[in-house]
C-alpha cells in the first residue's frame, strides 16, 4: 500500500496544503463512479454512452493551446532548449522565474483544501529511461484520461514511487495578471525543467497533460542519443518493426492499427540500442466520421473505461461520430489493451526496418507513395510537411499547408536537427528504408481512399514495393512505383489524376517554392546547405 501521508507531505512541499482527501491511483470502477456521479456540473460531468464509454466536454479548448505554452528560462534550459525566435517561430516561449512563481501560486492555491485525484504513472516503456510522473487534479475524468494514456505501474512499482515530474492541473484557475507579465492570455501551460513541474491553468483539454510529458521526453532522451519520435509503431509476425511519422490527422493511429500486425503504440516512441519502445499506455484516437467499416479496431475499443471527448451524444446515449459541431477534433482515449493485437507485456520491439512519413497534401501534388534516398529522408523529416487538418488546434478549421519540423515541431524541446541526426543514425545502424506516403488529396479533389493507402502500406511492409518498377516525379525528383498490388494504378502518379497535367505542374511549382522557402531556416549551417539538393526544385 502507498503511504498517503507521504504523498500529502510531498504535495505540501510543492505548495498544495490542507488536502481534504486523496483518491490515489483509483481503479477504473472508482473513476467511472466519480465522473458520472449526480451533482457534477459543467465540464466535470461525464455522460455514459451506449457503448459503456463515458463522454465529457472540454469546453472552449477542444485542442491544445500552443500559444499559451512556456518554459522557464534558467541555467539548465538557456542553451539547450530550441527557443522561439523571429527566424524560427515555435511554441517554446521563455518564462521568467517570477512569473513561474506567480502561476505556481495560483495552481497550488486552486488545488489546496480540495479532494484530489493523484495518479502515479510512467512515461516510457523502458525502465532505465522512463519518467516517473505524478498527475494531480481535482477533476475525476482528467485522472481517468491520464490513467488511460500513461503506463500503469504494478503494485510493486508503486512502492517507494518517486516522481521525476509532477503535473499540476489547475484547469479551473486562470491568470489575472497575464497582460502585465507579457503572456499570451489568461490560460497557461508552463514547464519548469529544473523543478520537474508542469502547470496547467484555464484549459480543460486532456491532451495538454499527454503532450506536455511528450515534450519533456523530447528534451531528455535525444540528449542521451535516443531517438524521440512523434510516430506510431507496429511489428509483424517476423519481428519486422515499422514506424509511422505524421502530424495529427494524417493517419498514424488508423494505419498502425492493423489486424495483421501487433501495435506497439499510436503516437509517441523512443528508439534506443534495444529497439523501438512506446512512451504511453494508451491510445488517443480521432473519432470524427469514425465507422466500424473503416476502423473496426478503434470502433471496438470504445467501450467501458474508454473516455470520449467533445462528441455529440444523442438522447438515447448513442454517439453521432459524424457530428463535428463542437469540434472536428473529437477524440477517444482508451488503455492500449482495448486493441486486441498489441505487443505484450511491454510495449516495445526490435529495431525498425521501415520508416514511413505520412503527409496529407491539401495541394494534390505529392504522390501517394515514394521511396526516399537517405538525403531525402533528412530533408522531408526536417520539412515535416502536411496540410493542417480541421480543428486539431484551436482556431484552425480549413486545410492549410503547414511545415512542422520532424512531424511534431509543437513538441520539440531541442533544435530539430538534433532529432534528425539521432533518427538517421538509428536508421543507418538498422539498415532501415524510408518512404513518403500521402494520405491527402489528388487531382480528383477527393482524398486518397483508406483502401488504397492500406494497400500502399502493405506493399511497403511486405517488401513488394521493392520489386516494383519505379518512375520519377519531376520537380520533386521522387521515386514512384508504376504499379502496386491492391492499389488503383491510376493514382500512383499524381499527374494522371488531373484532366490537364499543366494544372499539376502549376500546383507543384507553387508547393516546391513553399518547401524551398521553409527550408531556408536550416541552411545556416553546412549540414543544412548540403540537404537543399535533396528537396524540390522551385
From Swiss-Prot:
- What does the entry list as the binding residues for ATP? 211, 230, 246-254, 295, 331, 447-448, 453
Spell out the reaction equation it catalyses.
oxaloacetate + ATP = phosphoenolpyruvate + ADP + CO2
Localization, per the record, is: Cytoplasm
> According to the UniProt entry, what is the EC number of this protein?
4.1.1.49
Q: Which residues bind substrate?
A: 64, 205, 211, 331
Keywords noted in UniProt: ATP-binding, Cytoplasm, Decarboxylase, Gluconeogenesis, Lyase, Manganese, Metal-binding, Nucleotide-binding
Does the entry feature the keyword ATP-binding, yes or no? yes
Return one Gene Ontology term, BP aspect.
Answer: gluconeogenesis
Q: Name one GO cellular component term.
A: cytosol
Q: How is the cofactor bound?
A: Binds 1 Mn(2+) ion per subunit.
Q: Which cofactor does it need?
A: Mn(2+)
Give the metabolic or biological pathway.
Carbohydrate biosynthesis; gluconeogenesis
Mind telling me which InterPro entries this protein's record contains? Answer: PEP_carboxykinase_ATP, PEP_carboxykinase_C, PEP_carboxykinase_N, PEPCK_ATP_CS
Residue numbers binding Mn(2+): 211, 230, 267
Superkingdom: Bacteria
Family matches, as Pfam families: PEPCK_ATP
One GO molecular-function entry: phosphoenolpyruvate carboxykinase (ATP) activity
**Subunit details for this protein?**
Monomer.
Which PANTHER family did the record assign? PHOSPHOENOLPYRUVATE CARBOXYKINASE (ATP), PHOSPHOENOLPYRUVATE CARBOXYKINASE ATP
User: Which family does the UniProt entry place this protein in?
Assistant: Belongs to the phosphoenolpyruvate carboxykinase (ATP) family.
Protein's job:
Involved in the gluconeogenesis. Catalyzes the conversion of oxaloacetate (OAA) to phosphoenolpyruvate (PEP) through direct phosphoryl transfer between the nucleoside triphosphate and OAA.
Q: What is this protein called?
A: Phosphoenolpyruvate carboxykinase (ATP)
Its gene?
pckA
Amino acid at each position: 500500500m502507498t503511504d498517503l501521508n507521504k504523498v500529502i507531505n510531498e504535495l505540501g512541499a510543492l505548495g498544495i496544503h490542507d488536502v481534504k482527501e486523496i483518491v490515489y491511483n483509483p481503479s477504473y470502477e472508482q473513476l467511472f463512479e466519480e465522473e458520472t456521479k449526480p451533482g457534477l456540473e459543467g465540464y466535470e460531468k461525464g455522460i455514459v454512452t451506449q457503448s459503456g464509454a463515458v463522454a465529457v466536454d472540454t469546453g472552449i479548448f477542444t485542442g491544445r493551446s500552443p500559444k499559451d505554452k512556456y518554459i522557464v528560462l534558467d541555467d539548465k534550459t538557456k542553451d539547450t532548449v530550441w527557443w522561439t525566435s523571429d527566424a524560427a517561430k515555435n511554441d517554446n516561449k521563455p518564462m521568467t522565474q517570477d512569473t513561474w512563481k506567480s502561476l505556481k501560486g495560483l495552481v497550488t492555491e486552486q488545488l489546496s483544501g480540495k479532494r484530489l485525484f493523484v495518479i502515479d504513472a510512467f512515461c516510457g516503456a523502458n525502465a532505465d529511461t522512463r519518467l516517473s510522473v505524478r498527475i494531480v487534479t481535482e477533476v475525476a475524468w482528467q485522472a481517468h484520461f491520464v490513467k488511460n494514456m500513461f503506463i500503469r505501474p504494478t503494485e510493486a512499482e508503486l512502492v517507494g514511487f518517486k516522481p521525476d515530474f509532477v503535473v499540476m492541473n489547475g484547469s479551473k484557475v486562470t491568470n489575472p495578471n497575464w497582460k502585465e507579465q507579457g503572456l499570451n492570455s489568461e490560460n497557461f501551460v508552463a514547464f519548469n525543467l529544473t523543478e520537474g513541474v508542469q502547470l496547467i491553468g484555464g484549459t480543460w483539454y486532456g491532451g495538454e497533460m499527454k503532450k506536455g510529458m511528450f515534450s519533456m521526453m523530447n528534451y531528455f532522451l535525444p540528449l542521451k542519443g535516443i531517438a524521440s519520435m512523434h510516430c506510431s509503431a507496429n511489428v509483424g509476425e517476423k519481428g519486422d518493426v515499422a514506424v509511422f511519422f505524421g502530424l495529427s490527422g494524417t493517419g498514424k493511429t488508423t494505419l498502425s492499427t492493423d489486424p495483421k500486425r501487433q501495435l506497439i503504440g499510436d503516437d509517441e516512441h523512443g528508439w534506443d540500442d534495444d529497439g523501438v519502445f512506446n512512451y504511453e499506455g494508451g491510445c488517443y484516437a480521432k473519432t470524427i466520421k469514425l465507422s466500424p467499416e473503416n476502423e473496426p479496431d478503434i470502433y471496438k475499443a470504445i467501450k467501458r473505461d474508454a473516455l470520449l471527448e467533445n462528441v455529440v451524444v444523442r438522447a438515447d446515449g448513442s454517439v453521432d461520430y459524424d457530428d463535428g459541431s463542437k469540434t472536428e477534433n473529437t477524440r477517444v482515449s482508451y488503455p492500449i489493451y482495448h486493441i486486441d493485437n498489441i505487443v505484450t507485456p511491454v510495449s516495445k520491439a526490435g529495431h525498425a526496418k521501415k520508416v514511413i512519413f505520412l503527409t496529407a497534401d491539401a495541394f494534390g501534388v505529392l504522390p501517394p507513395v515514394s521511396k526516399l534516398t537517405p538525403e531525402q529522408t533528412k530533408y522531408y523529416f526536417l520539412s515535416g510537411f502536411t496540410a493542417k487538418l480541421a480543428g486539431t488546434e484551436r482556431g484552425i478549421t480549413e486545410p492549410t499547408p503547414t511545415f512542422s519540423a520532424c512531424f511534431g515541431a509543437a513538441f520539440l524541446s531541442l533544435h530539430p536537427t538534433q532529432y534528425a541526426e539521432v533518427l538517421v543514425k538509428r536508421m543507418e545502424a538498422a539498415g532501415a528504408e524510408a518512404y513518403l506516403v500521402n494520405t491527402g488529396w489528388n487531382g480528383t479533389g477527393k482524398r486518397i481512399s483508406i483502401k488504397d493507402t492500406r494497400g500502399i502500406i502493405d506493399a511497403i511492409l511486405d517488401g513488394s514495393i521493392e520489386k516494383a518498377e519505379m518512375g520519377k516525379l519531376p520537380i520533386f525528383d521522387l521515386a514512384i512505383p508504376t504499379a502496386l498490388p491492391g492499389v488503383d494504378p491510376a493514382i500512383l502518379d499524381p499527374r494522371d489524376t488531373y484532366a490537364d497535367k499543366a494544372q499539376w505542374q502549376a500546383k507543384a511549382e507553387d508547393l516546391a517554392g513553399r518547401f524551398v522557402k521553409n527550408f531556408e531556416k536550416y541552411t545556416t549551417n553546412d549540414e543544412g546547405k548540403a540537404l537543399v539538393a535533396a528537396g524540390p526544385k522551385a
